Amino acid sequence: MTDQNNNQTSALRRADRLSTVVLLASALLLIGLAGRVMWIQTHVTRADASSLHSQHDVRVTLMARRASIYTSDSTLIAGSVRVYNMFADPGYIFDPKGTLNALAGAQLIASRRIMAKAMARVLNENESDFLPWLKSRLYYANGTLRRFVWLKRGKDYSFYHHFEMVKHGLIAKSRQALRNHHPALAQEYFHALDGIGFILSTRRVYPLGDFAGQVIGFANSERGLNGLEEQLNSLLVGRSGQAVYVKDAAARALWIKKKGYRLPSDGMRVWLTLNTTIQQIAQHELDKAAKQFKPRSSVAIVMNPWNGDILAMANWPELNPNDYQKTPPNFWRNRAVTDPYEPGSVFKPYNLSWALKNHVVTLNTVFNTYNGRYRDPTGRLIEDVGGWPSLTVENILVYSSNIGMTQIGWKMGIPMEYQAIHSFGFGQMTGCILPGESPGMVRPESQWTKGMETSVSFGYGIAVTPLQLARGLCAIANGGWLPTPQIIKAVEVSPGKLETWTQIAGPQPWKKIVPRSTEQLVRTAMEQVMVRGTGQYAISPLYRLFGKTGTANLAIAGQDGYHAHQYNATFIAGGPVPNPRLICVVCVHEPDPHLGHFGGTVAGPACSKILTRSLQYLQVPPDQGPKTDPWWGKEALLKRLKGLSH
């Protein structure tokens, strides 16, 4: 028993001595480290300190997510998704100087063979192609070793997951080789995919494809390049954040420093005024018209005349922002605002409104229309194929008489006609924030010459955009108020907090330009255009609509005069007549003249169908619809329209 106690005592003493030795050694080590730190603090230069800091601190950018864009009914039309971009480090993989790779010699060669087989599975390519392709990119043209080359970009998670599964399979084989006492083989499997990596980024996607493509535009992962994506870039892009993390000697992240850390701020989500269903209706009908009449391009706009909201803005040919490179750049622009043109007879209601407002005429005023041949005060010959001896002002609009409108224009005079154009917003920006908008072309009043009264009275000698036509038509529909067209409904200014565009940009100007009574008269005449005039092909079976046709010859670029067989066909309409809910403008540019070219027959049906289907969607109760005048029925209409420009 005594021996056992002695043994235990000896063991404890040895443990105490060992602890003392360890403690003394630790103390000496700490003293040495403290001394070293003091020496560094007093002797290391500023450059050395910066070098040490850079070796241990890594700054990374925390990307902000580009905000999404929605329709007014909260359908996503532009958003960002995470994508995986695969790269390779050829210099590391081939390691020509033997200083970079974890393996060397036969092991490196064997590991590359494993890599080739694995990457063939990942990339779905031939095993024999990968390494030769990569080796051909080992050096830059100047002989510098290349350390980075893209393999695949913009891939989704399934691609990344497939790579990770292949990699995990190689790691499993490495472990199995270790268990089987083959350490060299284990290393070859373990390091086989060294030098292959991923960089995470985002890609802009457009779930509805060509939905309002020219309006939305397109963007890359960083900024908007076209359309509203570009125009609203400062709202959508957000602000990137930053993190500073400390790494160890093996470049492994240890922790993130509090100082210098900044969370990213995502962009502000935007809701547009576009209605998903009405936009799709407009695009569908525009596409049908394009297939039937083979135009160069066409545009359709639907607006709410009471608040100026643009509910649809369609362009044909359409643009799919997901594959915008496949569409010629000429069709990237939004022609509803960028391309002014001479509108032809659809311009007559605006002039007539001003003449009625200023009591120059009434709807019952009768004009001699000279059986279809008339010379204006400058001697210019004006013709109406209809050949009417005389017409009331209402019928001048109904049958689109250029002779009648010429006389009204001359009765108004240049100052009043210019005032009409300016008051309806032509020749000036609409105030809408859509990019690339043209103000159109209206000569200053001082530059008007005698004879301009004639041209402008039926829509020549000026150039307007489809959006300007739609804006002016809103005033005819809503009782005389010229609105500012709206394309943005709301913006999420902070998480969960929406503000209307009016709250952000301030009240949008509206201007009272004509009395309600005047526009009621104009709508009455425009309804008769549909019932017994040039708009009969645009009659709705469900609603009383008011409208106007326009067929304009194209001017010869750089010369005086017009093409004989190139046209722009336009139709403007709204309804229902008693209380208009919507207005619509359809412009069909350069339809095949062998298939049709009149505004009433080419653009009219599309315009009417867009309005009818949209009003049905909004659950507007149908009225009985008008009956056509047998004298001006559709068969007679085709005969009478032949050769007319209206």
Residue ranges and their predicted role:
Residues 2-3, 78, 247-261, 265-267, ...:
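Beta-lactam-recognizing serine transpeptidase/beta-lactamase-like catalytic domain environment
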Residues 3-4, 13-47:
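Hydrophobic alpha-helical transmembrane signal-anchor segments
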Residues 47-62, 278-293:
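Short, basic/aromatic recognition patches
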Residues 60-124:
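Juxtamembrane extramembrane loops of integral membrane proteins
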Residues 61-65, 240, 294-298, 368:
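Short, small/polar residue-rich loop motifs at catalytic or cofactor-binding pockets
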Residues 66-71, 75-79, 83-89, 148-152, ...:
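Soluble periplasmic/extracytoplasmic beta-strand elements of cell-envelope proteins
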Residues 78, 87-88, 92, 114-121, ...:
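Small/polar-residue-rich segments within soluble enzyme cores
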Residues 84, 113-117, 121, 161-165, ...:
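Solvent-exposed, polar/charged alpha-helical surfaces in well-ordered, non-transmembrane soluble domains
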